[in-house]
Amino acid sequence: MKKNLFAALGILMLVTIFFSPSAFALGFGASADYWIPTFEGDLRVDGNGVTGTEINLKDDLGISNENIAGAEAYFGIGNHEITVAYSQVNLSGAKTLNTEIKFNGETYDVADHVESELNTSMIDLEYQYKLLNFKNILAGLSFGIIAKVKYFDGDVRLNSSSDDTKEDIHLPIPMIGVGAKISLLANILEARAKVTGMGYSGDFFYDAMADLSLTPIPFLNIHGGYRAMYVKTDSISDVYAKMDFYGPYVGLLISF
């Protein structure tokens, strides 16, 4: 009798875990974000057997901060979530050189007026599995592990009256990380954080963000926080780069 009772309780627990609404709950949504980062970066591009100059992009070329708009879509089922994100980085500057610069095999002399551009698309494909996903009426907590690929697809260009040269950049970055979310006030207010990164063979990357989000009405979420992204690589042929973006962001999410 006791064995039958324990067996029945065990079956009931399994049914509750695997067939509860949260185990197979569907969710999807799309968001638009606006990031206002400070930018710092160094770049060296070799070419034609000539070692390039290590360029401070702000001081040497006059490249300034630019805000970055992005879009994101996600789909989730139970504890699994897939996210695709896209943003476009367009940086430019113009300056009369006070030092000689060698870039991609070409030489830009002192007193040359150089216009420069750094343009790249950032595409993120991310999978998150929620190890902990606790919800009740007034509060909730989730914690997950993340696997992600960030892909940079762009170019950097220097143009003067005598030379015009461009180097393409194609860089896929595999990353791993964690994400956490704390929900308060019946999911009206949430605190969220996420960090991913990877380091290997002298390369190092990370992308981290934290924000507060408010859901004033169903399906609509307004959020704001801080994001930092760092890229250091010499794995692209003839390109050596260190780039740092950090600053606040705001966004709007519609979810179902």
State what each model feature region is.
Residues 22-27, 132-142, 185-189, 219:
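Short loop/turn motifs that connect adjacent beta-strands in outer-membrane beta-barrel proteins
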Residues 23-89, 251, 255:
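Short glycine/proline- and aromatic-enriched beta-strand/turn motifs that initiate or cap beta-hairpins
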Residues 137, 172, 196-207:
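Solvent-exposed loop/turn segments connecting transmembrane beta-strands
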Residues 188-203, 228:
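Transmembrane beta-strand segments that form the barrel wall of outer-membrane beta-barrel proteins
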Residues 204, 208-255:
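Predominantly the C-terminal beta-signal and adjacent terminal strand-loop region
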